[in-house]
Amino acid sequence: SQSVGQITAGIASELDQQNYLILLGNTELDEQRELGYLTAMQRNHVAGIILLGCYYSPQLARAFKACRVPLVVTGQRFPEVPCVYNDDRSAARELAQRMLACGHRRLAYIGGTEKDQAVGLARRQGVQDALNAAGLDGDKLPRLCCSAFTMEEGERCMNELLACCPDLDGVVCVTDTVALGAMRALRAAGRAIGTQVSLAGI
């Protein structure tokens, strides 16, 4: 995603200033590959390890805690492991609260896999928190899960939501890219964005 590219560029720039070389490994969110890279990098005596975008699991948490070199996880919370992450739940809650403050009451959510506790689970919970605080039933939030954070998936999910919830008046999307796809579907359906339907990505 664009954000991962920006984070990687920032890390590379800082390491370059400190005269470190960066070694990249792409695991495609495969836990066994993540564990394999972790072992290989320790054997090769790297100065430190930064992990971007892994899913939480007890096995990974144990491996991270046992790591013999400095290690930081970004984008996900692992107990007793140094982590840098966003407050995804609060971000989603505040976004939904803004929609509710504009008078929208029939919100829907386009999210990601809830194996990802930060982006997938916490963001959905944030939207539900806002609905519950407004006296609505967050458990009844219409939601769909994207298989990837792409415009195509956003468009597909939005079309499905329009078919099952034609009276929705607000949509929170897991990312801006997904929201762009949802916008395309709303326009094709003749829905006026900003008046008939509010739309936003986190």
Residues covered by each model-derived region:
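Short beta->alpha connector loops
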Residues: E28-E31, L52-S57, T177
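Intrinsically disordered, low-complexity polar regions and short flexible loop motifs
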Residues: I49
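Phosphate- and divalent-cation-binding pockets in alpha/beta enzyme and binding domains
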Residues: S3-Q6, R33, Q59-L60, G126, ...
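Active-site-adjacent beta->alpha loops and helix N-cap segments on the catalytic face
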Residues: Y56-C67
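A conditional alpha-helix N-cap/helix-loop micro-motif detector
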Residues: V4, D30-E31, G53, D88-R89, ...
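N-terminal winged-helix
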Residues: S1-S13
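Short beta-strand->loop structural element characteristic of the AMP-binding/adenylate-forming
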Residues: I22-N26
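Bacterial carbohydrate/catabolite-sensing allosteric modules
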Residues: G10-L21, G36-H45, K65-V73, R77-I202
